[in-house]
Amino acid sequence: MNNQYIRREVFCCGTCHELKSFWEKEISKQTFYRELEEDRQERSALKKLREEWRQRLERRLRMLDNPVEKEKPAHTAD
């Protein structure tokens, strides 16, 4: 289990300053973990793959909406 999810128990802090510094440290740890996770997600190939597939789907939909006709109707003399 990740340390960031472990519940922290504060049993005895003699002063408000100790309590405040404890929570400031906890907040800075959480911020650090969050930034690491954001960096990991930015480096992930998943975002790039999703964008590539989105572009492919858009091209496919455009092609289906506006098909290129291979056969042109023959001119008939009336």
From Swiss-Prot:
InterPro entries associated with the record: FAM240
Give the family from UniProt.
Answer: Belongs to the FAM240 family.
Q: What is this protein called?
A: Protein FAM240B
Species of the source: Homo sapiens
Name the lineage. Eukaryota, Metazoa, Chordata, Craniata, Vertebrata
